[in-house]
Structure formats: C-alpha cells, structure tokens
Amino acid sequence: MKFKDEIIIFDDFIEKDYQEKIKSELFGSREKGTEFPWYYIEDVTAAYSDESQHRPGLSHSYVDLPLEMTGDEDDILEPDSAGKVMSNYHKLFVPMLKRVGFKLGLSNVRVLQGRSFLQFPVNTDGTIDLPHIDILGKAEFIVALYYVCDSDGDTVIYNETKESKTYTINKSVTP
C-alpha cells in the first residue's frame, strides 16, 4: 500500500464554513428542528466486550463495515467489497473524504466504514483508551480522523498493526 505505516496530519484542511456546517449538523438545534440521531454506546473503543473501559458516549454510523472485514488475518476479502451507506448524514462528510483523497493523491476513495462519536469528559484520571485496530483482517485502508471540537487528550498511534500483548507508541497527536 502506498501509505503503509505513514502518519500524515493535515491541520485546518477544510474551510471554516464547512467546519461549522459539520459542527452545526452534529450538535443539532431544537429551535431549528435539527436533532442529530445519536445513539448510546457503552464504550467507544471496545463496546460490550471484555476489554471495555466503560467510557460511554454517543455514536452514529454512516457506513457499515462489511462483515467479511471484521474477521481475522485469514479472511479473504473481495476486491470490490465496500460498506453500505446507512445514514443520510454520510453525504455531509463526502466533500471532506474527497479532500483527503485529493491531498493524498488518490483519485478513487471508497468508504469502508464511517462513524462519529460524541465522547463525554470521563477521562479525568489521565488514562488513555485501550489500543484498538479499526479494521481487522487483510484490508488495506486509511483512517481519516476529524475532530469537530476539543478532545479529552491526545490520539495515540501505536507501531503494532495487529493485536499484541504489548504496544509501543509511534506517535501521539494533539488535536
């Protein structure tokens, strides 16, 4: 893959009015009749699993990851496998995803998974979320991570790309 093991950061890569549009849609407004459909999730990193840290938040899925991409290293993936759009709000993020593709020199960007999380400020003891892998198996993918507002800490990116007993930090990114 062209960007294997690279961490590329684009600061302020979308226009301010587009940033505000995303923020306005996600936060909604009762006065304007625009309530965004957030759904409770028990833990944004490892919900309902033994690894859960029980850090609740709200979640919204735009594109559902195909089942065959949630498996283990021996899974065989179809080359045209792509996620199913589950939310009308997906189109809100398409211009940003196209911009990511453009900045990376990619002419065709397929979305395998799209989701948003609204985390509550429960990380008051300085601990960080457990390491996790966004897509298991043999899929080659790029993660486009966008912060709508301040976060409760850095995003930690590890060297390991498979489940491991120990993890070493590659980079810590302050949003």
Model features per residue range: what roles?
Residues 75, 79-175:
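Catalytic core of non-heme Fe(II) oxygenases with the double-stranded beta-helix
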Residues 1-108:
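Non-heme Fe(II)/2-oxoglutarate
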